[in-house]
Amino acid sequence: MSIKSDKWIRRMAEQHGMIEPFEPGQVRESDGRKIVSYGTSSYGYDIRCADEFKIFTNINSTIVDPKNFDEKSFVDFKGDVCIIPPNSFALARTMEYFRIPRSVLTICLGKSTYARCGIIVNVTPFEPEWEGYVTLEFSNTTPLPAKIYAGEGCAQVLFFESDEICETSYADRGGKYQGQQGVTLPKT
């Protein structure tokens, strides 16, 4: 299994629709102002956060249970900047839609710009033949409110291609998050 380069990422995005919309270069400015970078890097792709967020709240005094998740645990928010309360959590989604080839597995890591501020981005791997918008998990580990910027980079996806095609892909087993469109809450 080997990591894939910028050339491979560009080819797969442009010829096979692996990432849509796709940015073939690295974008660091928008309208003359510096932003958290996104787009193709040497061995990965920096994804952007869309403007749809679900922010944890305790106003309804629910219990967080991954097997029986209560949607009242979140407040929906739409905007260019999301403020995550101290020691709290928010969900978002990528601006990019992914179609992962059968021979590929991805690993997604948070960007150091956010990590150095105590904001941790967690995303599980994109499995072979999974497709959809990626649900992003942001943890504010600080005692202060933290900003997340929509339309800017938030994490980097690394692509690994196996030397052997898997017997059963995510699509084959009817994965529960296949084709997800918006911010998707836990399912069992």
From Swiss-Prot:
Residues that, per the record, bind dCTP: 111-116, 135-137, 156, 170, 180
Gene3D superfamilies the record matches: 2.70.40.10
A Pfam family matched in the record: DCD
EC numbers for this chain: 3.5.4.13
Reaction(s) the record says it catalyses: dCTP + H2O + H(+) = dUTP + NH4(+)
Top EC class, one word: hydrolase
Keyword terms: Hydrolase, Nucleotide metabolism, Nucleotide-binding
GO terms, molecular function: dCTP deaminase activity; nucleotide binding
Positions of disulphide bridges: none
Family: Belongs to the dCTP deaminase family.
Function: Catalyzes the deamination of dCTP to dUTP.
HAMAP family the UniProt entry points to: dCTP_deaminase
Record-given protein name: dCTP deaminase
Source lineage: Bacteria, Pseudomonadati, Pseudomonadota, Betaproteobacteria, Burkholderiales
